Regions:
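Bimodal "functional hotspot" detector
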Residues: 1-326
Length: 326
């Protein structure tokens, strides 16, 4: 367990720590530091194993969860709202309606309509040409730079549209009984997480697969196999809180318990508390100058969790149709 002593979090690990290499100990201690410090690599901790103090085993580690902050945007009553500052600010006006999900940044983004078609979204909120070569999609999310990723309506293919260059990717190891549903890209853009549903003849759950990129950073394909990180079924939303912490939740259904989970991937799952009204979408972005978990409920209220992921929920916006999917 973790104990607090003189404002320093202390823990004692098993003798297995002593059998690790210096590099392995460094990664483990850095992951512990990032996890306990809510992504801060400067958090002071004390890590002991027997009589050995490994508190500084990660001094040479470059692993860092301080990823660039992407401002969180919402779609609210025809307006695109930035939550970057402590007060919601309108940054664009739009005629978007019947929106399933959208992606937005200072350079624009994309919008997925309930009809399944994706249109490019300019920075002023106006919509333009169809994306993904006119293919219908079930979900979209943001990638590196101008990349927009998505899952087609068949649930069998992952697609990426990078400024009009479209690539369709098969997922190695996906069998006929399995389909893809929600998805999210890691902050560095080299991993995709996605939920898998099965008709009963195969495994459901949450998986992560690597993205292969060319020397110029463009997408070349997917790695040879995906790693199943959870066997939780019915997962409809997910987000990378940082490089190492991943969150997901099951589909919201009125009157039924909703399950939220988080884990340091790959690693064991722990429960993630959700607001009392549940969640219909989640994302991670800059709110009030800090990187925060953001959740939208079925009443259109956006809440963020303060401090650690176990902190209290605070209302950030209301009358919201959709969160910008980071």
């Amino acid at each position: 367990g973790v104990q607090m002593r003189d404002s320093v979090m202390e823990m004692s690990l098993s003798s297995a720590m002593e059998r690790m290499t210096d590099a392995e100990r460094g990664i483990l201690v850095r992951q512990i530091r990032l996890s306990l410090g809510d992504s801060s690599a400067e958090t002071e901790i004390k890590v002991m194993s027997g009589n050995h103090d490994y508190s500084h085993a990660d001094d040479s580690s470059s692993l860092d969860a301080q990823t660039p902050l992407n401002p969180m945007y919402t779609l609210s009553v025809g307006n695109i709202i930035s939550l970057k500052s402590y007060s919601a600010i309108r940054v664009a006006q739009t005629d978007l309606s019947d929106v399933r999900s959208f992606v937005f940044s200072e350079q624009g983004g994309a919008v997925l309509g309930r009809d399944g078609y994706v249109k490019r979204l300019a920075e002023d909120g106006s919509t333009h040409a169809l994306m993904f070569s006119g293919r219908m999609m079930k979900t979209i999310c943001k990638g590196n730079d101008s990349e927009i990723w998505g899952i087609d309506t068949s649930g069998k293919h992952i697609m990426v549209d990078d400024a009009g260059t479209v690539l369709t990717l098969d997922v190695p190891g996906l069998v006929s009984a399995q389909t893809l549903h929600s998805m999210s890209l890691s902050p560095e853009g080299d991993r995709i997480a996605f939920s898998i549903e099965s008709d009963g003849g195969a495994q459901s759950g949450v998986a992560i697969i690597g993205i292969c990129r060319d020397h110029d950073g463009s997408v070349a394909g997917l790695s040879q196999a995906f790693a199943l990180v959870s066997t939780q079924s019915n997962v409809s939303m997910m987000t990378f809180y940082n490089d190492v912490t991943f969150l997901y939740a099951t589909q919201y259904e009125r009157g039924r318990a909703q399950i939220g989970r988080r884990q340091m991937v790959p690693g064991p799952e722990t429960s993630q508390a959700l607001p009392d009204n549940g969640a219909v979408d989640m994302a991670t972005g800059e709110v009030g100058t800090y990187r925060r978990l953001v959740v939208l409920d079925h009443l259109g209220v956006v809440r963020t969790v303060d401090g650690s992921l176990d902190g209290a929920w605070t209302i950030a916006d209301s009358q919201v149709t959709s969160l910008s999917v980071q």
